[in-house]
Amino acid sequence: MINYKYGTLPSSQIQKEKKRLQDAIFILLPYKEDNYEFLDAYFISLQQRLCGLNHLFGEQAKILTLMSILESARYETEFSKYRKAILDACALIDEIEFP
């Protein structure tokens, strides 16, 4: 069981959420390549989701780092740098610890 702001959650639920979050970040790659018209709105929605996660699990530094990487990627015009930021963000999800 994992402790959070309002009680506890099963570890399996946390692992599933980490996978969903990685998928939500990874999809930013094809969205950028395809010039998805709602890409900016998607970034905003993802940042709001991360902000909520941060509040629920004790404001961890790695979540702030993740948010910073994504904010940087949001404005990156060079695709190779954008891709690296997105892949770094996906990898960072595995490093987030839940108390």
Located regions from the model:
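Short terminal alpha-helical segments
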Residues: 1-38, 86, 90-96
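Amphipathic alpha-helical binding modules
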Residues: 65-99
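Amphipathic alpha-helical interaction modules
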Residues: 20-68
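Generic structural signal for short, flexible, solvent-exposed coil/loop and linker residues
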Residues: 3, 10, 52-55, 71
